[in-house]
């Protein structure tokens, strides 16, 4: 493993990943891979998650293609050095910030969206000029295999490497020194990744999870609310990091919510949900049994049917859920939706704030002041008002968690920034040494006073131009008054 990481590092040190033209070529090659081998990619995703190819395309491939196009369109601007404002002491110098690649990046993917969750950060790492080692999740083995097969056929084989394996291989990888580690997964493993990274002082981006709350105000259209929640909760069989984990609402709304979700489930998946091509399965037997254990002692108002042989769990709703029970102590990551009754928005806000910061917050209400109040009074990785999950689709947003739901962010420009070092550069002249005497010993109060004058006043090009014009105006006025014109 050490030899492989060193091989990738030597490829990075060769400098060929840095030129803009090379980065654009690699991104175009990646897009070509997705387009030309679409059927193979979709088949692998479908095999891992019992997902229809239409769902695999809409949930993963579209996002990847959109991200590549966004990078190709904007990358020439992002890589350009940006001038900064200057003070009087540096007004004659060149001062700018130059984005610089970090080096060798490790991307550790997750199994629930096994393609997009490794390729989307890879896009950002390539755009920033890095070399990358990719470790797909071993639980989504078909996608891991197809990625390992296809990437070397389209991308630089020395700079972008896929390493497959399980816990042992990941543990060995984490012993190596990287310049950034990007991990998507659960909080427990996130802590292990961060601990390993700390030994090398390696910065990390941790895309974790948590229990994303969904508050439903009594002032809303429950038909629309329940359609949107049903879509977001049961998509991918509930195995989505930003799926609504539980509902907070007044007790009087519970029966209406259950009924409307029931009707929507029938509309989305038909009378026989098990036969629907749009309803996936739990990834493996261990997660299947874990989710079943969360149902023990609960009041099942909808669903609850299971089939261990196919790892099927029906869309399920629990009512009158006690916050102290097991289902409210861990991220569900499955098609089980608890409803916790609260008296009002104040109690809902307190409930959220008493727990770990979630990856997402969802609030439904016709009252936008109430939505913005909950935004102001809570903390979460992201927020969508009157819908779920949709903030993920906007690549001008940073996507990431806060607190135990993660650290750092990516998507669009935020991916480029995550994998770049913003390097400040000041270019001075070896002339005008007289002005530098102010900073040389011996010191004096006069030098300190002049230093304050020079350092505490900042200049940009516009202000410098105005200063020059003002100075020329004063000179012209003096000359006129002196009778030269």
Swiss-Prot record:
<keyword id="KW-0472">Membrane</keyword>
<dbReference type="InterPro" id="IPR016162">
    <property type="entry name" value="Ald_DH_N"/>
</dbReference>
<dbReference type="GO" id="GO:0050061">
    <property type="term" value="F:long-chain fatty aldehyde dehydrogenase (NAD+) activity"/>
</dbReference>
<feature type="transmembrane region" description="Helical">
    <location>
        <begin position="464"/>
        <end position="484"/>
    </location>
</feature>
<dbReference type="InterPro" id="IPR012394">
    <property type="entry name" value="Aldehyde_DH_NAD(P)"/>
</dbReference>
<keyword id="KW-0597">Phosphoprotein</keyword>
<dbReference type="GO" id="GO:0052814">
    <property type="term" value="F:medium-chain fatty aldehyde dehydrogenase (NAD+) activity"/>
</dbReference>
<feature type="active site">
    <location>
        <position position="207"/>
    </location>
</feature>
<keyword id="KW-0812">Transmembrane</keyword>
<dbReference type="InterPro" id="IPR016163">
    <property type="entry name" value="Ald_DH_C"/>
</dbReference>
<dbReference type="InterPro" id="IPR016160">
    <property type="entry name" value="Ald_DH_CS_CYS"/>
</dbReference>
<comment type="similarity">
    <text>Belongs to the aldehyde dehydrogenase family.</text>
</comment>
<comment type="function">
    <text>Catalyzes the oxidation of medium and long-chain aliphatic aldehydes to fatty acids. Active on a variety of saturated and unsaturated aliphatic aldehydes between 6 and 24 carbons in length. Responsible for conversion of the sphingosine 1-phosphate (S1P) degradation product hexadecenal to hexadecenoic acid.</text>
</comment>
<dbReference type="InterPro" id="IPR029510">
    <property type="entry name" value="Ald_DH_CS_GLU"/>
</dbReference>
<feature type="active site">
    <location>
        <position position="241"/>
    </location>
</feature>
<keyword id="KW-0560">Oxidoreductase</keyword>
<dbReference type="InterPro" id="IPR016161">
    <property type="entry name" value="Ald_DH/histidinol_DH"/>
</dbReference>
<keyword id="KW-1133">Transmembrane helix</keyword>
<keyword id="KW-0520">NAD</keyword>
<dbReference type="Pfam" id="PF00171">
    <property type="entry name" value="Aldedh"/>
</dbReference>
<feature type="modified residue" description="Phosphoserine">
    <location>
        <position position="293"/>
    </location>
</feature>
<dbReference type="InterPro" id="IPR015590">
    <property type="entry name" value="Aldehyde_DH_dom"/>
</dbReference>
<dbReference type="GO" id="GO:0046458">
    <property type="term" value="P:hexadecanal metabolic process"/>
</dbReference>
<feature type="binding site">
    <location>
        <begin position="185"/>
        <end position="190"/>
    </location>
    <ligand>
        <name>NAD(+)</name>
    </ligand>
</feature>
<comment type="subunit">
    <text>Homodimer.</text>
</comment>
<dbReference type="GO" id="GO:0004028">
    <property type="term" value="F:3-chloroallyl aldehyde dehydrogenase activity"/>
</dbReference>
<protein>
    <recommendedName>
        <fullName>Aldehyde dehydrogenase family 3 member A2</fullName>
        <ecNumber>1.2.1.3</ecNumber>
        <ecNumber>1.2.1.94</ecNumber>
    </recommendedName>
</protein>
<keyword id="KW-0443">Lipid metabolism</keyword>
<keyword id="KW-0492">Microsome</keyword>
<keyword id="KW-0276">Fatty acid metabolism</keyword>
<dbReference type="GO" id="GO:0006631">
    <property type="term" value="P:fatty acid metabolic process"/>
</dbReference>
<keyword id="KW-0256">Endoplasmic reticulum</keyword>
<feature type="topological domain" description="Cytoplasmic">
    <location>
        <begin position="1"/>
        <end position="463"/>
    </location>
</feature>
<feature type="short sequence motif" description="Prevents secretion from ER">
    <location>
        <begin position="481"/>
        <end position="484"/>
    </location>
</feature>
<dbReference type="GO" id="GO:0005789">
    <property type="term" value="C:endoplasmic reticulum membrane"/>
</dbReference>
């Amino acid at each position: 493993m050490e030899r492989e990481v060193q091989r990738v590092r030597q490829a990075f040190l060769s400098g060929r990943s840095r030129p803009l033209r090379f980065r654009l070529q690699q991104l175009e090659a990646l897009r070509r891979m997705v387009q030309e081998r679409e059927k193979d990619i979709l088949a692998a995703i479908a095999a891992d998650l019992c997902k229809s190819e239409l769902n695999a395309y809409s949930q993963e491939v579209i996002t990847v293609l959109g991200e590549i196009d966004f990078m190709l369109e904007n990358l020439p601007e992002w890589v350009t050095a940006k001038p900064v404002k200057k003070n009087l002491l540096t007004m004659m110098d060149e001062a700018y910030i130059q984005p610089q690649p970090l080096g060798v990046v490790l991307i550790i993917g997750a199994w629930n969206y096994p393609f997009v969750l490794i390729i989307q950060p890879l896009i950002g790492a390539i755009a920033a000029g890095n070399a990358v080692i990719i470790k797909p999740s071993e639980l989504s083995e078909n996608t891991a295999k197809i990625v390992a097969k296809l990437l070397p056929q389209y991308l630089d084989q020395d700079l972008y490497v896929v390493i497959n394996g399980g816990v042992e291989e990941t543990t060995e990888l984490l012993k190596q020194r990287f310049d950034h580690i990007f991990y998507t997964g659960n909080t427990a493993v996130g802590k292990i990744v961060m601990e390993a990274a700390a030994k090398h002082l390696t910065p990390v981006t941790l895309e974790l999870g948590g229990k994303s709350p969904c508050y439903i105000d009594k002032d809303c259209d429950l038909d629309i609310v329940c359609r949107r929640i049903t879509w977001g909760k049961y998509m991918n069989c509930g195995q989505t990091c930003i799926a609504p984990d539980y509902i907070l609402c007044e007790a009087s709304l519970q029966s209406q919510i259950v009924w409307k979700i029931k009707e929507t489930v029938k509309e989305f998946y038909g009378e026989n949900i098990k036969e629907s091509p749009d309803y996936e399965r739990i990834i493996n037997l261990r997660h299947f049994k874990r989710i079943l254990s969360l149902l023990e002692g609960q009041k099942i108002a909808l669903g609850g049917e299971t089939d261990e042989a196919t790892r099927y769990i029906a869309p399920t709703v629990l009512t009158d859920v006690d916050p102290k029970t097991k289902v409210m102590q861990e991220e569900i990551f499955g098609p089980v939706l608890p409803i916790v009754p609260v008296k009002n928005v104040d109690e809902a806000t307190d409930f959220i704030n008493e727990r770990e910061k979630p990856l997402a917050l969802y609030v439904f209400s016709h009252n936008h002041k109430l939505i913005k109040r909950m935004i102001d009074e809570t903390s979460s990785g992201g927020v969508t008002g009157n819908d779920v999950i949709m903030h993920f689709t906007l690549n001008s947003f940073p996507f990431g968690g806060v607190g135990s739901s993660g650290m750092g962010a990516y998507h669009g420009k935020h991916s480029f920034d995550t994998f770049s070092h913003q390097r400040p550069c000041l270019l001075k002249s070896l002339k005008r040494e007289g002005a530098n005497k102010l900073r040389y010993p011996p010191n004096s109060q006069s030098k300190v006073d002049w230093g304050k004058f020079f350092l505490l006043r900042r200049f940009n090009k516009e202000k410098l131009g105005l200063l020059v014009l003002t100075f020329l105006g004063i000179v012209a006025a003096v000359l006129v008054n002196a009778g030269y014109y």
